[in-house]
Amino acid sequence: MLLRVYQKVQMPSREQLHGEIILLWLFMVIVIRNNKESTGMIYEAIKKLVKYGLDTGLITEYDKIYATNQILEVMGLDEYEEPAEEPGDIDLEAVLKELLDYAHETGVLAEDSIVYRDLFDTKLMNCLMPRPSEVVAKFWDIYNHKSPKDATEYYYKLSQDSDYIRRYRIARDMKWTTDTKYGTLDITVNLSKPEKDPKAIAAAKLMKQSGYPKCQLCMENEGYAGRANHPARNNHRIIPITVNGSPWGFQYSPYVYYNEHCIVFNGKHTPMKIDRAAFVKLFDFVKMFPHYFLGSNADLPIVGGSILTHDHFQGGNYTFAMAKAPIEKYFTVPDFGDVEARIVKWPIAAIRS
């Protein structure tokens, strides 16, 4: 019976076998060619990212090979052939998208959501970043030999070039001005990051502090790789300053509501408190950076709109409508005769000196 079954099986002819072998060979050629093209394209993207680092001054020619190898490691690659063609102008968002898509296709980037893509591309950008000590040394060298304004311009550009401040997302924000009886007001709708919920802010203030970093304003965020519920800060650099005799940090907000929107924060994880010392801290900062303003959110959860668990202020290089609003009344304060105070025409109580 087995013999009869075997006899009924029709063996493929020599011509059929030959045809199938050719088809298999063609399939393998196509796969190899596609892999080569894909690898070649990713090499081009890597070269573009390195050129971006050179063009922006994040790295020098001496850093080129090192930066390339760091990018290869993040991408899960162990070899590289530099493309002969020199890239033109670099669109950072497009280059990062190409690298992220490839990383997801090859399994290096497991999840293809915005959270995990942001975690991954921040690692890529860190391959181009100078160490914190280099940034700090250059900042204070410019501060001491040129001016505070030149120092902050260097640091702000670095924060943008590093993609810590994502220019292409900030560009989507809606901004306009409107004339009112209080003057011309600035209206902004931040689309790069949603506003905090007041209830969540209040709950956060009551929660027992744990974890690492304890919050998004802690010094320990510098260089932190991030996680699903905490943003990556591999490419983040902080400038250490002294405020009211204590160590503080100076950085820019990654979500920039206005020009050079900065955050000045306590070196220790301590709650916000508006008291006399808060005003001393404000004046200390503007003495160091006279071209900046500095202010504080309310230390109340309903109206603060801020991280109340960490003492900090916000400022920048911008003139708001409140600073230009008309004056309703002048007055002096006893024991401070050299200070002229003014009641400002504003929808809430406001005094300007």
Show the residue positions of the predicted features.
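Helical scaffold of the NTase/Pol beta-like nucleotidyltransferase catalytic core
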Residues: N235-R237, H269-L294
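Conserved His + Asp/Glu catalytic blocks
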Residues: K273, F293-L294, L300-S306, N317-S353
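Histidine-centered divalent-metal-coordination microenvironment in nucleic-acid enzymes
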Residues: N259-N266, V303-F320
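Low-complexity, intrinsically disordered or signal/transmembrane-proximal segments
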Residues: Y6-Q10, Q16-H18
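Active-site microenvironments that recognize anionic phosphate/pyrophosphate groups
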Residues: I32-P271, K345-I348
